[in-house]
Amino acid sequence: QAGADIVLTSAQIEKIYPYVLAAILTVVYNFIGAPMPPANAYTAVLGAAAGASAIFVGFLSATKAVILGTSSSAAYVILRKSGFLSMLFGYIKSSIYSSISLAVASIILMFFDPENPVALNIWHLKIENGIFIPWVFLGALSVLTLLRVSRLLFRLLDQV
């Protein structure tokens, strides 16, 4: 029906908000001129992003291992039957994937010369420093998906 309101459930919002916010932050980054890290700190910034994403992956992997280590507990069985664990494991997986993607993008960008930024020409739109657009999106997505997992873990701990 035309003009029908779109209503999202809290579960749907939970699933999509990291992607939507990351896209919004990326648009804002582009709107403010898509600044690159300073040339003297270029590789340090990219290395820090790769290192932070490796820490994220380690934290998320350890979190999943700890949860799986409690698989014989009654609480684990209840959480599994409720569907909470499969949802949480899916969110952990997406957070790990986004963090690994950020690390890979950071390493790839180290091969670009910060003194000669690359502009992307898409249709009739010229995006300065366009090679950083995916990096900014992945950086925001990595942080937002990690925050989502952390928030759900704290909600889980509040129930115990």
What are these regions (language model features)?
Residues 44-60, 136-139:
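Alpha-helical transmembrane segments
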Residues 98-120:
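Alpha-helical transmembrane segments and their membrane-interface junctions
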Residues 42-44, 49, 121-131:
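Membrane-interface segments at the starts/ends of alpha-helical transmembrane spans
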Residues 124-160:
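Alpha-helical transmembrane segments and their immediate juxtamembrane interface regions
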Residues 62-82:
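Membrane-helix interface/capping segments
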Residues 5-9, 79-93:
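Membrane-interface segments at loop-to-transmembrane junctions
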Residues 5-51:
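Long, highly hydrophobic alpha-helical transmembrane signal-anchor segments
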Residues 15-22, 90-103:
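Select subsegments of transmembrane alpha-helices in polytopic membrane proteins
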